[in-house]
Design a protein with these regions (language model features):
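Phosphate-centric recognition/catalysis
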Residues: 68
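Short, surface-exposed ligand-recognition loops at beta-strand->loop->(often short) alpha-helix junctions
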Residues: 11-15, 71-74
């Protein structure tokens, strides 16, 4: 039997429309559907995973077990400002193992990391 492929990534959240709209703006995705139970966003070019946001009654209470790392096309500082303008907040800066990144929180407090970009010395060959 062939290995399974990943169909989608699902976030549990209190306000799926708000969180889906935030992530669509961050990733350049399109909001495909928003209804009373959730929301769905996809890459407009059909690349990447579909991301689903489902409503749950409880709020976030512990650190995420899984999070997204986003790689800027410019600098980390520019990307941090961009995602802050979309509703994210800065949680902490991390420098270890010869690299650095910034942990951010989406509008419902889910952690994600903004990595260093090409203007910060990152290259795909490194």
């Amino acid at each position: 039997m062939p290995p399974l492929g990943v169909d989608s990534l699902t976030f549990d959240c209190r306000d799926p429309a708000k969180v889906a709209t935030f992530w669509a703006s961050v990733l350049g995705y399109e909001v495909v559907e928003i209804d009373g139970d959730g929301a769905d966003i996809r890459d407009p070019n059909g690349l990447g995973w579909r991301i689903i946001f489902l409503v749950v009654p409880e709020g976030k209470v512990v650190k995420n077990r899984l999070h997204l790392d986003v790689r800027p096309t410019g600098s980390m500082a520019e990307e941090i400002e961009r995602v802050r303008s979309l509703g994210a907040s800065q949680h902490r800066y991390v420098a270890e193992g010869g690299s650095f990144w910034t942990v951010m929180l989406d509008p419902e407090g889910n952690e994600f990391c903004v990595l260093r970009g090409p203007q910060d010395g990152w290259s795909p060959e490194a």
